[in-house]
Amino acid sequence: PLGPLPPGWEKRTDSNGRVYFVNHNTRITQWEDPRSQG
Amino acid sequence: MGNCLKSPTSDDISLLHESQSDRASFGEGTEPDQEPPPPYQEQVPVPVYHPTPSQTRLATQLTEEEQIRIAQRIGLIQHLPKGVYDPGRDGSEKKIRECVICMMDFVYGDPIRFLPCMHIYHLDCIDDWLMRSFTCPSCMEPVDAALLSSYETN
């Protein structure tokens, strides 16, 4: 299991049901799960 | 003259590998080479629904009965055939060039949805419309009752 998201990150789903990730500190969004980026 | 012709450095190559390894470690449900993810928004926008064409309610304000009706409506909409606009094909796309809901021309590759009356619209445009009024915007024909009954018996 990947464990909790790093601080400041939030997992969201877009209107097509695809999962993406939001970083409230840097205000960026990305498809990649930050937990799998090491 | 700038260094636009510089040979790839080890950094460039490692970056290449890095982006490939990123793709291998994606979260569920994401496609690597899709368009960029949605822009940053402080709060997740709460969906707004229309129990009747004249009413607008936050998803959190709907009664249980309204939630059920809207869920059924969404189910019905998903049953309607969808495709991609291709003027080259012989289908109804040949005649219809503009989405009358947004008044924009169809562009090759646009996601579209066909109604039983064979009028076509942008997928997002008609899905929004059908959530308010389950009729064809062009000919006002109610979406085929057969579609309704076949959905309810499943």
Curated annotation (Swiss-Prot), chain B:
Lipidation sites (S-palmitoyl cysteine): 4
Xref: Gene3D superfamilies: Zinc/RING finger domain, C3HC4 (zinc finger)
Low complexity bias spans: 41-51
Protein's UniProt name: RING finger protein 11
Pfam family, one: zf-RING_2
Main localization category: other
Annotated spans, Disordered: 1-53
Effect of residue 15 to A: Loss of GGA1-binding
GO cellular component terms, semicolon-separated: early endosome; extracellular exosome; nucleus; recycling endosome; ubiquitin ligase complex
Oligomer status and interactors: Interacts (when phosphorylated) with 14-3-3. Interacts with the E3 ubiquitin-ligases NEDD4, ITCH, SMURF2 and WWP1. Also interacts with the E2 ubiquitin-conjugating enzymes UBE2D1 and UBE2N, but neither with CDC34, nor with UBE2L3. Interacts with ZNF350, EPS15 and STAMBP. After TNF stimulation, interacts with TAX1BP1, TNFAIP3 and RIPK1; these interactions are transient and they are lost after 1 hour of stimulation with TNF. Interacts with GGA1.
SUPFAM superfamilies per UniProt: RING/U-box
Motif (PPxY motif): 37-40
Protein location: Early endosome; Recycling endosome; Cytoplasm; Nucleus
Modified residues (Phosphothreonine): 135
Classification via InterPro entries: RNF11_RING-H2, UEC_component, Znf_RING, Znf_RING/FYVE/PHD
Regions of compositional bias (Polar residues) in chain numbering: 1-12
